[in-house]
């Protein structure tokens, strides 16, 4: 394993509730009579990208109006307001990194293992989350960062992962991806990257066929995984465990 690639929303932090709240705050601010609850948002998450999600919903509830000439302008405006609300929520605290994330980032830095990000979230959302947890110089911790501005086609297409591989200068089999959703898993696997999945409540019912492992989270000494996982010396995933799982995948593939 020569690099570790992280998704962001749902993987680094359980962000989807904050995104949902931000969408609803934006709807209220612009006077839209929309309100998304958790079950609806779970379904909408099958559509990657906030603007794409807004367009998909608009076509669901009012297909005629969704063909209007100012739809794109409206979606851009609503999404910008939603992004502001999300950043405010992240900046206020209360949105911790998931178990194991901060520890693994630190371990990788100490070991000289390159880290990368492959996400369909916006640069603004990405910066808000990681600056809050890793500081203003967070980008220096990652060898490659690809987000919604990198590729036009979003997950489950593999484009963002292929872009990361190109920037890293590595083959797919040299890397390990950490994802939380079915869309993310399909994107990583379509790029040929072995993938560990840590679902959230919003993605728990997705299909994870093809995943190397599906874990509740990556664990920490203070918050271990519920049970021991073969290949891990502890009830948390350290770099040694990730390397063992990755190595097992390569052995099976030969």
UniProtKB/Swiss-Prot annotation:
GO terms for MF: hydrolase activity
Keyword line: Plasmid
Gene3D superfamilies: HAD superfamily/HAD-like (3.40.50.1000), Putative phosphatase, domain 2 (1.10.150.240)
Family in the record: Belongs to the HAD-like hydrolase superfamily. CbbY/CbbZ/Gph/YieH family.
Protein name (database record): Protein CbbY, plasmid
Species: Cupriavidus necator (strain ATCC 17699 / DSM 428 / KCTC 22496 / NCIMB 10442 / H16 / Stanier 337)
Gene encoding the protein: cbbYP
